[in-house]
Curated annotation (Swiss-Prot):
This is Tyrosine recombinase XerC. The active site is at residues 169, 193, 261, 264, 287, 296. Forms a cyclic heterotetrameric complex composed of two molecules of XerC and two molecules of XerD. It comes from Rhodospirillum centenum (strain ATCC 51521 / SW). InterPro entries: CB (IPR044068), DNA_brk_join_enz (IPR011010), Integrase-like_cat_sf (IPR013762), Integrase_catalytic (IPR002104), Integrase_recombinase_N (IPR010998), Integrase_SAM-like_N (IPR004107), Tyrosine_recombinase_XerC/XerD (IPR023009), Tyrosine_recombinase_XerCD (IPR050090). Belongs to the 'phage' integrase family. XerC subfamily. Site-specific tyrosine recombinase, which acts by catalyzing the cutting and rejoining of the recombining DNA molecules. The XerC-XerD complex is essential to convert dimers of the bacterial chromosome into monomers to permit their segregation at cell division. It also contributes to the segregational stability of plasmids. GO terms for molecular function: DNA binding; tyrosine-based site-specific recombinase activity. The gene is xerC. Residues 14-105 form the Core-binding (CB) domain. Gene3D superfamilies: 1.10.150.130, Intergrase catalytic core. It is found in: Cytoplasm. Its main location: cytoplasm. GO terms for biological process: cell division; chromosome segregation; DNA transposition. CDD domains: INT_XerDC_C (cd00798).
Amino acid sequence: MTGGVPSLGFACQPDAAEALERWGRWLEHERGASTHTLRSYRADLAGFLAFVAEHRGRPPGLNDLGALDLGAFRAWLAARAADGAGAATRSRGVSGVRSFFRWADRSGLLHNPAIALLTAPKAQRPLPRPLAADDAALLLEEAAAVPEAPWIGLRDRALFTLLYGCGLRISEAIGLNRSDLPAGAASVRVLGKGGKQRDVPVLPAVREAVAAYLAAVPWGGGRAAPLFVGAKGDRLSPDVARRQMRHLRALLGLPDSTTPHALRHSFATHLLGGGADLRAIQDLLGHASLSTTQRYTDVDAEHLLSVYETAHPRARRQGHQTVRSVCDALPPRLRNQESER
């Protein structure tokens, strides 16, 4: 499979291996699947085929896969559960296997009606774990305290301020190029999951943090250059960003749940607590389904009741605009009406 995803060996016959590679290319190029999804699906299919090979006594081909009954699929799930795989992991495995079988059916390679009868385990998704408002503000203020090189500290502050001020995923933030967030820009264009683009308003606090970082970074570059870079000038790795966050939370005594993604959760939770419309938050986060965004309404009331009056902790810092300005920048159809509050 292309796209930088490492190849995994499949315990199967050549015809099935070729089909799996074609399916992987289809996922990547036609469906716009992320590297994480590609890697996970390949691992799930590799485990499934290894299970089938072990229990049939030989690596399966396409004909063997087409002949599997519902009991075989259920036995695989039972084996995964016995190995300690949780409901969420098994549910994702079913999604990956089902995706391959459906693609193979549409491609005329095999037909297996049993896969349509396989139900995925119900995974109880954990509630988002946002930071308290004061902790989020403290983290952004102290974000430059960890690195030895001043420009790296400014980079971390700019990155974490962007995550919190715009609600981006870490992959979206480090995927930005300089042209995506030009100086003084009122919004940033983000390429989200499935290759979907969205425009997110940018607060002055975010613009100021990014400008300070760009003024200090020793690596140049044109509009196509990555916005966030590592110590050698290459595009910043998400693992480096997570490591910097671990160091920072240890320094500040913040809980282990303080991660780059927690800043995205905090963005949504604090906006909701300030009265932002749920559909506006859905658009800002790039959620395909409103039900995903609705999880934030179930977050512990302690988080919502402790939110300040105007919607965002950055509003308490002199010279910084509140996140209500993000809502004001949205189309009228996305804003709460007074009669609805």
